[in-house]
């Protein structure tokens, strides 16, 4: 079972949602899966993209005409309608960005899984890793995560849709159904990003275990046969170190492909989540301030809080997963300098900077490989980027919290100043 076959259910779902334009074709002489170009899937994707763009533009013009007829509605209802419209537009823009990136970066998606296959072959041959068991475990974990995420989305959106169906107005059912469809596609795009990042982290964990088991020096009795075995073990350890270094080089290239495949989606999705969280918090503040403590008002406040939960969960999981994956490179560097060496051995003593001109190949190989691998870990650091605008890690959470707090303070101050001016004018 290769990685593509292990993730076949996910790819089938992404094909339906226009997030995977490749056709999965089994080769005639093996059990794997090949990626074949499908013009029908590409035509399907471009058709849905054009239709979604037209629907979004039509919704913008329709909303502008509706706002001209709603001068008589209250301030709180007007603000609530504006908040809903902002989130609807943000979700549709994120949906369009995901569809466009899936079509535009289809070659990068193919290169990602091709590079992943090369990494698995190196792990299987050079490091003797049971890649088959790793893929089976990955498929089980992916299925389990998909069930939990789908359950969370279903519960939150059913509560939101129920609250809006009970509200005043005849256009809410169509309004929210048109919102839920892009939301599910964006959620599936998030799951694609989670899965790709988890694939990278799984390979880094294998490298970390291999490096922790690496020993260049093992104590034993000074017997000729034992010394010969010791030299064989050291040579095997050097081969293992070279393999770890080569695999890390490919993992670094794999992360670069991941940033190409999903960078624009991460940028637009995180931006949309920021808008949704900020607008929902502002709307909840207004409801708390002006609600009459009726069951309907409480339901609206709870629905707004639940509405923010998927957006907050997506940003939280994405930031933590990317940050922990990037930290694996730092752990590799720490493990590299904890490799057991014998300073009395000339080949190992060369690690501190002394090289013998006339020596065996192993004597030169040890310091060169460790030193070069250390420099490689220093300069080829793993980072997940949202189209080059910002890095996705735990600092993103702090930035979003700070920006949300700042904008909420500004919006609340504007609202309170407008209320004060309105009350003064009514008093006069």
From Swiss-Prot:
MF terms from GO for this chain are: G protein-coupled receptor activity; ligand-gated monoatomic ion channel activity; taste receptor activity
Ranges in coiled-coil conformation: none
Gene behind this chain? Gr2a
Q: How does it sit in the membrane?
A: Multi-pass membrane protein
Q: Mention any Pfam family matching this sequence.
A: 7tm_7
Q: What is the lineage of its organism?
A: Eukaryota, Metazoa, Ecdysozoa, Arthropoda, Hexapoda
Instruction: Give TM regions.
Output: 41-61, 146-166, 174-194, 251-271, 301-321, 350-370, 396-416
What family is it from?
Answer: Belongs to the insect chemoreceptor superfamily. Gustatory receptor (GR) family. Gr2a subfamily.
The cellular component terms of Gene Ontology attached to this UniProt record, alphabetical and capped at eight, are:
axon; dendrite; membrane; neuronal cell body; plasma membrane
GO terms for biological process?
Answer: chemosensory behavior; detection of chemical stimulus involved in sensory perception of taste; male courtship behavior; monoatomic ion transmembrane transport; sensory perception of taste
Q: What domain of life does the UniProt record list for this protein's source?
A: Eukaryota
Entry keyword annotation includes ATP-binding: no
Tell me what this protein is called: Putative gustatory receptor 2a
Q: In which tissues is it expressed?
A: Expressed in neurons of the terminal external chemosensory organ, the dorsal external chemosensory organ, as well as in the dorsal pharyngeal sense organ of larvae.
Tell me, in a sentence or two, what this protein's role is: Probable gustatory receptor which mediates acceptance or avoidance behavior, depending on its not yet determined substrates.
Organism field: Drosophila melanogaster (Fruit fly)
């Amino acid at each position: 079972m290769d990685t593509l076959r292990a993730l076949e259910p996910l790819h089938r779902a992404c094909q339906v949602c226009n997030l995977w334009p490749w056709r999965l074709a089994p080769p005639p002489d093996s059990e794997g899966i090949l990626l074949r170009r499908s013009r029908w899937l590409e035509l399907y994707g471009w058709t849905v993209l054009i239709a979604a763009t037209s629907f979004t533009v039509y919704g913008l013009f329709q909303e502008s005409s509706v706002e001209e007829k709603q001068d008589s509605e209250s301030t709180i209802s007007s603000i609530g309608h504006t908040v809903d419209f902002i989130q609807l537009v943000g979700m549709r823009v994120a949906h369009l960005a995901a569809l466009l990136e899936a079509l535009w970066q289809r070659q990068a998606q193919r290169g990602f899984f091709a590079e992943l296959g090369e990494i698995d072959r190196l792990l299987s041959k050079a490091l003797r890793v049971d890649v088959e068991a790793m893929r089976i475990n990955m498929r089980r974990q992916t299925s389990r995560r998909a069930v939990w995420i789908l359950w969370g989305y279903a519960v939150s959106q059913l509560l939101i849709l129920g609250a809006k169906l009970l509200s005043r107005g005849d256009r809410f059912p169509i309004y929210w159904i048109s919102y839920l469809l892009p939301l599910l596609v964006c959620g599936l795009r998030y799951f694609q990003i989670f899965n790709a990042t988890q694939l990278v982290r799984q390979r880094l964990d294998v490298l970390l275990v291999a490096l922790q088991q690496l020993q260049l020096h093992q104590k034993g009795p000074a017997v000729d046969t034992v010394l010969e075995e010791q030299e064989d073990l050291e040579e095997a350890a050097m081969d293992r170190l070279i393999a770890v270094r080569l695999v890390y080089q490919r993992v670094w290239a794999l992360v670069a492909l991941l940033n190409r495949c999903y960078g624009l989606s991460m940028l637009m999705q995180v931006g949309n989540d920021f808008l949704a969280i900020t607008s929902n918090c502002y709307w909840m503040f207004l409801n708390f301030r002006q609600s009459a403590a009726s069951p309907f008002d409480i339901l609206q406040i709870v629905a707004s809080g639940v509405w923010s939960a998927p957006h907050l969960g997506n940003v939280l999981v994405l930031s933590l997963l990317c940050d922990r994956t990037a930290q694996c490179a730092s752990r590799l560097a720490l493990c590299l300098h904890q490799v057991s060496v014998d300073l009395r051995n000339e080949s190992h003593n060369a690690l501190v900077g002394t090289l013998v001109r006339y020596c065996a190949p192993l004597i030169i190989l040890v310091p060169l490989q460790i030193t070069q691998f250390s420099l490689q870990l220093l300069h080829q650091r793993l980072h997940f980027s949202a189209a080059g605008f910002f890095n996705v890690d735990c600092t993103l959470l702090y930035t979003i919290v700070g920006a949300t707090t700042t904008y909420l303070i500004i919006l609340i101050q504007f609202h309170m100043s407008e209320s004060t001016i309105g009350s003064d004018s009514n008093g006069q």
